[in-house]
């Protein structure tokens, strides 16, 4: 595991060249949480209620905005207001996967207006390097109003059974991240990827990509559709900087208490990793 993973969030924030990553680490340190809650609900009311109730205990809220049956201006303004109120970032799990010209329009514009409210987005690199280049171009354009407040995670690995996001796909994900590091903040992956080397790229001394790991659940090992879970401790131990939990929190009998439990477990695992416990 990279030596950067052994550093505290505050230490990494102090030297990180990416302003959004710096802010993310500062949020985590201030709130003592590395939890991302995956709010897979289907109405604006449910989403905003969940964001308000869980906001104090999370660093990031992850949305699938296209599953909302009533997406509107209220969704955008409400979510942005709650992010400000509770000091968390918004991650739209759009998984962009198309040619560059199309994803630029999907990201900045369109019905969902994703660039307007989502600090973080993600993409698959199945279309090739062009998808990362296109999103990076959009974010660096002179007329893009959000500048360094936006960032991209590359979907380098998945936790579903039989996932094809392995091998050369994962290696190329790291290659593209290194090439477009001003916009790419890290990966959605099951482990730390900083030591990946290829004929195209190799790790640099200052490299510090953030790792988000999905499929974190304290009470289940999987579901009927092939999802494979791991605990906060095992995820952080493999290199996760931020753990993503969905049903384990929002479907719990008491989502607030569940969020607090994930917060504690995730934070304890982080302290153990950096040698502060």
UniProtKB/Swiss-Prot annotation:
PROSITE patterns: OMPDECASE. Keywords: Decarboxylase, Lyase, Pyrimidine biosynthesis. Its EC number is 4.1.1.23. InterPro entries: Aldolase_TIM, OMPdecase, OMPdecase_AS, OMPdeCOase_dom, RibuloseP-bd_barrel. One of its GO terms (molecular function) is orotidine-5'-phosphate decarboxylase activity. Belongs to the OMP decarboxylase family. This is Orotidine 5'-phosphate decarboxylase. It comes from Aspergillus oryzae (strain ATCC 42149 / RIB 40).
